Amino acid sequence: MVVEIISVGNELLTGTVVNTNAAFLAEQCVFLGFECFYQTVVGDDKSRLQELIKTAEKRADIILINGGLGQADDDITKDSIKEVYDKATVLELENQNGLTNGFILEEQTKRIILLPGSPKELEPMFTEQVFPYLQEKTDMVIRTRTIKLCGITEKEVNDAITDLMNEEQNPFIATYDKCGEVHVRVTAKATKEKDAVKMIKPVVKELKHRFNMNIYTTHEETSLEQSCVDLLLANNLRISTMESCTGGMLAARLINVPGVSEVFKVGYVTYSNKAKRKVLGVKQSTLKKHTAVSAEVAKEMVQGISLLTKADVTVSVTGLAGPDGGTKEKPVGLVYIGCNVKGKVVVEEYHFAGDRTHIREEAVVAALALLRKCVLEYFSEVTFGNK
């Protein structure tokens, strides 16, 4: 079946609001096995919306319209639809997260679905009510499996699986950049559930073979920080963190995981050079010669926190998150991350792009990825050495 997505709102046209709804709906269509050839944004104008709907119904079986459903003067979607589909059967979608309900209009073979503009309202409404409704409209069973990777870029993943990513292929493979992580989603269509599941298995096996240690989970619900905590627990390790530019975000991600008290010892934020010297024992000469944003300082930070807390594993982060302070030699987005696993120290250099918040978030993901990599490599070497 063919789906078309229409997003309504002047704020989308002016760039005041980013259109995350269209991305979400398009992704859900992939899960359903539907094809989406057009996505359109239209302002709060009834005649333009009606014109767009009439065009969409000529080329799509299902039209997903989001936005313009509230009580404000510029919420014109429902009235526009009523005038075009005055004889359609109407099914109401209850909004459990807001005031404005959604609607499904059934007009012969066409389905027009109206959804609120707020993502907090749209996403649960679609997932809980619209997705099951649409699933019944197809005789195909759709099953998906998500493989989550870290410590690798989306381009590197795509380059490695070009031969597997044929759009006409079943199962269908798609990659998604998730702020430093890469998620690979495998979607299979079949007439029976067992057949769809069977089709996915060899693809997942091949992905595991190609990416090996970069894959941290094949379960949708498992986060990167959860996988790190599980790894620490499995190896009976305690961890401490020392952060500068990330300001405690790494510790916060770890502490979000239930049961982390079994492995997490201490988290420090040493933003100033003075704090780095006083708390960690970073040398004044090192700071003067290399500056706080350097591999040398990241190394002394991670060694200092190891001595201070006696943790088995320690991680340090220092960098330039911007927007100011960058130079040609040390630009904004330059980050050094150190990891010490039982005395084996590794320091990596990273270059991130984006605003201050995005750079810090990417740095945290990189720190978790490096933590995981270093622990795995340490124990693989220990195991090999014991053979």
Give the predicted meaning of each segment.
Residues V8-N10, I65-D73, P116, K189-A190, ...:
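Glycine-rich beta-strand-to-loop/alpha-helix junction loops that act as flexible
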Residues V3-I5, I112, I239:
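Conserved hydrophobic helix-helix packing surfaces used for dimerization/oligomerization
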Residues E107, L114-T187, K192-I200:
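Accessory alpha-helical/coil subdomains and C-terminal extensions
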Residues R48-E51, K58, A72-K137:
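Proline/glycine-rich low-complexity loops and linkers
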Residues M1-Q39, V197-K198:
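Glycine-rich phosphate/diphosphate-binding loop of Rossmann-like nucleotide-binding domains
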